[in-house]
């Protein structure tokens, strides 16, 4: 005889009563305790299975949450590092720009100072040239003045001496009123006699 459940036996008894088997006594099988134990075991197993399943699900969900948490953390880290790298790139670019600007500004200042020094040097050279030419001109002018003065003095000396004798006839002195004139070159020379 195979194993039947309690509900199957009850249905069999009911059908026997309907058919006329009134003296049939329903007897529960002797293996009730064992079946109860088995059911208890299966119930325990199912409970443990449920627990293990729940714990498995929990562990899986925990793993998932942990992985997602790790992913989110790694994403945050990567995002932060990306932001940092972008900011670093920006700062590096700005630093490079500032360095290039400083270099260009220095070169511009140098070129301006060089231009100024070149202009001042040119001015000083032109000033020196003008000063030298002025000195040369002044020297030549002084020399010409000296030569002119010398020639003028020599001319005065040459011209004054006979002219002085020519003007003596105008003066009233102790000479005789008789005067003799003769031409000596370009000037009239007066010959006077005493009284």
Swiss-Prot record:
Enumerate the Gene Ontology biological process terms.
sporulation resulting in formation of a cellular spore
Does Repeat appear among the keywords?
Answer: yes
Keywords, sorted A to Z: Repeat, Sporulation
- Chain residue ranges for the region called 9 X 13 AA approximate tandem repeats of [HY]-K-K-S-[HYFC]-[RC]-[TS]-[HY]-K-K-S-R-S: 36-154
Signal peptide positions are none
Q: Does the keyword Repeat apply?
A: yes
Q: How does it assemble?
A: Homodimer.
NCBIfam families xref list: CotG_ExsB_Nterm, spore_coat_G
Q: What is this protein called?
A: Spore coat protein G
Q: Which organism is it from?
A: Bacillus subtilis (strain 168)
Q: What is this protein's gene name?
A: cotG
């Amino acid at each position: 005889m195979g194993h039947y459940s309690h509900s199957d036996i009850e249905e069999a008894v009911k059908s026997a009563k309907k058919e006329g088997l009134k003296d049939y006594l329903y007897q529960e099988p002797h293996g009730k305790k064992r079946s109860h134990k088995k059911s208890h075991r299966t119930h325990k197993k199912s409970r443990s299975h449920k627990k293990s399943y729940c714990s498995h699900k929990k562990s899986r969900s925990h793993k998932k949450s942990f992985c997602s948490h790790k992913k989110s953390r790694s994403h945050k880290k990567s995002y932060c590092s990306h932001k940092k790298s972008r900011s670093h790139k920006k700062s590096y670019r700005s630093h490079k720009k500032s360095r290039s600007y400083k270099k260009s500004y220095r070169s511009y200042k140098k070129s301006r100072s060089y231009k100024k020094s070149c202009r001042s040097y040119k001015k000083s050279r032109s000033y020196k040239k003008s000063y030298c030419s002025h000195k040369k001109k002044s020297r030549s002018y002084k020399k010409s003045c000296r030569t002119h003065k010398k020639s003028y003095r020599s001319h005065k000396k040459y011209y004054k001496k006979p002219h002085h004798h020519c003007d003596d006839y105008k003066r009233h002195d102790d000479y005789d009123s008789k005067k003799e004139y003769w031409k000596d070159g370009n000037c009239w020379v007066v010959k006077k006699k005493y009284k």
